[in-house]
Amino acid sequence: MKRIQAFVALSMAHLAIGQDINYSDPHSPAHQYHTRELNDPFTRMIEGFETGERELDYGSGRAFIASLLEHLNVPVSSQLLVFSRTSLQTRYISGKNPRAMYFNEDVYVGYIPGGKVEIISLDPDLGGIFYIFDQPKSGELPVIERSGRCMNCHAVAETRRIPGLSLRSVTPGPNWGAIETFRNKQIGHQIPLSQRFGGYHVTGDAGFTEHKGNRIGREVGGKVITETLEPGTQFDWSIYPAATSDILPHLLLEHQSGFVNLVLEATYRARAYQYVGKGEINPRHYAVLQSLGEELVRYLLFADEAEFPAGGIKVDPQYCEDFLADRKKASNGISLKDL
């Protein structure tokens, strides 16, 4: 009987989704994405950056990004390097000039030597708030603008159509654009490790090599032939604040992105459903939210997490220390951040 009830509930959820409203429309009065007062960490700091109250180091690109990260409480050790041209500033990115990414629980920073700085700052109601600005020259103050172009990649199917977090895994070709794509329209810790990290550098002795990182490719006779691109062989580590692109921040970013996008979809759906129902949620929409709730619980419990190597994974101790620095302990001394 329970199996029949579960099947009926799931069928109702799928039916509801098929007949669904456009829950993700940012212009909807339910969301007011572009006009609602913002409550994300970076927005609250903008005035301080633009007036110089929050001082930044303009000595070099490396010094600038390091000082910005310090203000945002984003650890330098979270650095990930991506050499595929799979983001907004494609003309700057290559194996000779990788794009660096840094993150904590609420703010995500993109830095390309010679390019613009990109920010995703999470608003609890609206999701990702996107900013982009030039790296100021010495003596100048930053002019920070909210970006709408980022939504072209950060509010699509793989982000559950809400302003969320986007991750891709590709094989870059000779011009650093994608010639092969993996895990299409999927983000989260359920993705097999063998399908992850394409277009990124992975440093350190992680203990396994069955992933798509550190590879470039070319098409030969209709097939993609790949070869290893060792980190640091085409660029100088000294222009970045750290000399790592470690496996642990890779894994945590994947897990975190899947969680954030799932929570934001539930938030957007619930708000949209309440709006069209004038404060009420009808049974059809309730079934959708119930299905999402069950998916969220499974995600929180790591029920469908991809299998790890039997011997575990070796990680950068510096990032471990930085990640655990703000852990909040329960009464028994353990924390959800414990690794």
Q: What is each stretch, according to the model?
A:
Residues 16-18:
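Boundary at the C-terminal end of the N-terminal hydrophobic targeting segment
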Residues 20-114:
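N-terminal alpha-helical interaction blocks
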Residues 307-339:
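Acidic/aromatic/glycine-rich contiguous surface patches that form carbohydrate-binding/processing clefts
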Residues 31, 35, 61, 241, ...:
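Intrinsic-disorder-associated interaction segments
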Residues 2-9:
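Sec-dependent signal peptide recognition
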Residues 20, 109-318:
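Sequence context surrounding c-type heme c attachment/ligation sites in exported
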Residues 43, 62-70, 249, 290-301, ...:
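Generic detector of well-ordered alpha-helical segments enriched in charged/polar residues
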